[in-house]
Amino acid sequence: MKSVLGFKKAKVTQEKISMVTCYDYTLAKIINSTDIDCILVGDSGGMVLLGKKNTTYTTLDDMQFMTQAVANGATDKFIVADLPFMSYRQSLETTMQAVMALIQSGAHAIKLEGSSGNLDIIKHIVDSGVPVMGHIGMTPQFINSFGGFKVQGRTEEAAKHLLEEAKLLEQAGCFGIVLECIPANIAKDITQNLDIPTIGIGAGSNTDGQILVLQDMLGMNTDFQPKFVKKYIDGSKLFSDAINTYVKETKANTFPTKEHCYDYC
């Protein structure tokens, strides 16, 4: 998938869209060789890569650094980058400066969270030639308002509000919407009522696509294991075992061997 046109086509043909997050050059190069449709340079990188408490601490400088790294490695993939916390709630001028910074860092589109107060901003960004992905449900930048990472849309009123939000984001010009941590039946209803694709994370199997944090699906993060994550490998064990093997071989002087040494000429 090389552009937003791929998202539109996938919605029409009902081909599921696969997305993962990425924050660095090395993993981006690996992803570039896979069949993944799209990469999200998420503000979650502030937590996953930099160890910050939550995404409200991720800065625009962080996002530029990570976006540049991913763009350098994943040269054949469509890249969406998150607008970080408050970068699009101060003024239109600062919003557009942030958008420009991420696009010039290598992103092809940007993502922002929520609908309230964002609709005119989204329209302006889209009218400026930059594709926008929406994000509703459990929006991590609102963690202080939610009182933590909590499933959203569990009441009839909340579910109705989510559908209204999704429709407003579509009308504002979003080419797709992330649905995070909402009941599967609500995500299905939203998906069926939109002409743009939905990308689920903790939203069941009836969305138009799925996204996971790469380090979560590779089993690299042992401290964070939410219900919606499937570990495809135990990366933490694989890496720690490899490092421990290196340590043992170093101490036993079995590494390096002749094949790892240079000959004198």
Swiss-Prot record:
Any one Pfam family match given in the protein's UniProt record, by short name: Pantoate_transf
Gene3D superfamilies reported in the protein's UniProt record: Phosphoenolpyruvate-binding domains (3.20.20.60)
Detail which positions bind 3-methyl-2-oxobutanoate. Answer: D43, S44, D82, K111
Checking InterPro entries in the record gives:
Pantoate_hydroxy_MeTrfase (IPR003700), Pyrv/PenolPyrv_kinase-like_dom (IPR015813), Pyrv_kinase-like_dom_sf (IPR040442)
Specify the domain of life of the species encoding this protein: Bacteria
- Subunit structure, briefly? Homodecamer; pentamer of dimers.
Q: What is this protein called?
A: 3-methyl-2-oxobutanoate hydroxymethyltransferase
Q: What is the lineage of its organism?
A: Bacteria, Pseudomonadati, Pseudomonadota, Gammaproteobacteria, Thiotrichales
